[in-house]
Amino acid sequence: MSKQDSLWFKSLRWLQRKLVHTVVVPHDPFDDLNLDPSKPLVYVMKTESVSDIAALSEMTEKLGLPSPYEELEVNGIRAPRVVCLEGSKPLFGQREGGEQYIDYFKRLLSVHKQNLELDIQLVPVSLYWGRTPGKEDDTMRAAVLERQNPTWLRKCLMILFLGRHNFVQFSNAVSLRYMADEHGTDKRIAQKLARVARAHFERQRKVMTGPQLPKRQALFHALLKSDSITKAIKEEAASKKISESEARAKAMEYLDEVAADYSDSLVRIAERFLTWLWNKLYKGINIKGAEQVRQLHHDGHEIVYVPCHRSHMDYLLLSYILYYQGMVPPHIAAGINLNFWPAGPAFRRGGAFFIRRSFGGNKLYTAVFREYLDQLFTKGYSVEYFTEGGRSRTGRLLAPKTGMLAMTLNSVLRGVERPVTLVPVYLGYDHVMEVATYHKELSGKKKKKESVWQIFGAIRKLGNFGQGYVNFGEPITLHNFLNEQVPSWRDDIAKDPDQKPTWLTPVVNTLANQVMTNINDAAAVSSVTLTSMVLLASEQNALERSQLEKQLDLYLTLLKERPYTDYTSVPDGTGHDLVSQGLELKKLQIESDPLGDIISIDQSIAITMTYYRNNIIHLMVLPSLIAACLLRKENCGRNDVISIVNDFYPLLEAELFMGIEDPSQYANQILDILVAQGLVVECDHFEVVDSSINQLLLLSGTISETMQRYAILFNLLEVKPNMERSELEKDSHRLAQRLGALHGITAPEFYDKKLYATLSVKLKELGYLTDNQGCSDIKRIKERANLLLRSSVKQTIVDSVHAEHIA
């Protein structure tokens, strides 16, 4: 009988299963790590441990991986399935050396020399009993629970107290075939493998637990001694005519107001609560791109998460997902409005640090905040902040606030050694709890001050909220970004470290727009967002079920055959599946009659549903524009479509943070799909197939309100080419209100003054607001915008503009 089959071992494993709850990272090793089930596999672990192997065995059984107790048989050789770099640590004395494990690596490599077809996968596996990073100068607790090198007695205590927080992490496999072919099979290569594995396990531990936490008061005293805060204290004392000790006390107050007080114990408790909460709220959370972020952590990057801001739930969702993806929850920049009892202290111990809405010229506060942020980067803590500054009320991304990005870039300029990388994150929900409140605020109702009662009120309304979505976008490494934007930035800073570079503000603005674009590039399409888009484009927000399903199938085809980006996610299934999900979530209504089912949006929530449509409108706005061209322009050819797309794309790009590199190529690909789907026929020009007119009409409806805005702007500019930006914004907003009143436009963003401000800035950039140079372009684009509108809407715009500016 083998050792692991003995009654003693079976009893220990049974007891461990009762005490231990294990989380696997990543959740699907086959998919995320590209493991090949057809090839032999060997697990590599740092330390030999009965309990670790037992925990691994339980997970491999669930995942369909070979058991660590099952021997490897290749080429007539039998070998253990697990190789450990260190022997188990005895209660007294020294552990065994690693020579036998180097010999084992050598044996595995040698087998590849004998069999050229063989390719054994070496899979590193890390186990963590709890994820406490420890504190700087920690002594007593580290002695009791020495997690990295525990004896069997300490391991028993860890299982007893931390068994419910066990994580098993699989890493990318190393091909021994590749190692043997590229580097040989001798002992030197085996030793190199062992060294690389040790370094890997050490880096992996830092990713999972994070750096050690400083003592809060010790951190404050260290920060107060920094040059920048010392200088700010002296300036504060001189300007306010107070003593330096009083100014220092004020700086200490600011630090206490700002700084997080991260508690691993609270995070463990919060993890249990949040697991209950997500299971109560959502049927699942869909995650895309976590592996690339884990790799950035592993490669030593300082990670700054920059998510979009939909809901107060964002604070909890991203931290929860990162925790379960084997990464440390970040320190989150939270608005000072959330620092109310009891939520504020809880958020602070969960990693939140608080920031005022405005620094208001307070130089001491500014110096304190910047130095604290620098310290987070220097010590290696990941950070999270919302570049929009607040929650979007319309479902579209807001124009970015650049303050935190500027401070992050300044930290890089001041010499943060590790590469600092921004990770844009798209957060989406099938249901946003605050969405009804948002539309009340947009209608003029005053925003309520955050309080604990609001949280209790939200929790009381918990229900079936469908799915949540967390997509990680394309990372931006700031050193590389600076090299591209300002190749001489290092020399410029070295010449005068205290002088703000003239290029800094435009570079920060470019960075902010790139962040927002990368967030939108990672959008998640869902049943709610896509059905909202289709139904809101119909006349009465209602369609026959068969027609709705057919339209959804068309949109799914467009999104899958020509993906917006590699970071975008599109749901599996068919239009029928999406409609069923929408009905289940009670976002849609169904009425039946002898002719079939009718699916609609209740008029009372139609405005609310624009929020969900707006989450992904940028994904379908160009296909919608193309459909409008095909329907409304006579004898429309490819060149006509591409020319119209190129005219409007710069405005769409500015308004919707779009990142299509080649709009002409994209338009051609969409046209090819429409031809392949039988909606249009192409000869010298496009002919719309009669049976497909309704599908193209629905598709074109998505851009109708956007095109109305552009028609307002260009009709105004043609009548008065030299308009000032402020006048253009005011007049266009007034015309939008008139148009909405006459034609029943209810989408909140249609009346958003900030949106017209964004468009006016872009028009100025494009040269349409300077002298008469752009007059011919303005006339052409005005005619094209008018062409793509319904005749009644076009007439209202033309008449209103002439009545105001010509009469």
Curated annotation (Swiss-Prot):
EC number: 2.3.1.15
Gene Ontology MF, one: glycerol-3-phosphate O-acyltransferase activity
Main enzyme class: transferase
Entry GO CC: plasma membrane
Annotated catalysed reactions: sn-glycerol 3-phosphate + an acyl-CoA = a 1-acyl-sn-glycero-3-phosphate + CoA
Domain statement: The HXXXXD motif is essential for acyltransferase activity and may constitute the binding site for the phosphate moiety of the glycerol-3-phosphate.
Biological process per Gene Ontology, one example term: fatty acid metabolic process
Chain location of the short sequence motif HXXXXD motif per the record: 308-313
Subcellular location: Cell inner membrane
Cytoplasm found in the keyword field: no
Highest classification ranks of the organism: Bacteria, Pseudomonadati, Pseudomonadota, Gammaproteobacteria, Alteromonadales
Protein topology in the membrane: Peripheral membrane protein
This protein's name: Glycerol-3-phosphate acyltransferase
Underlying gene: plsB
Pathway: Phospholipid metabolism; CDP-diacylglycerol biosynthesis; CDP-diacylglycerol from sn-glycerol 3-phosphate: step 1/3
Main localisation: membrane
Pfam short name (any one): Acyltransferase
NCBIfam families: plsB, PRK04974.1
Family classification: Belongs to the GPAT/DAPAT family.
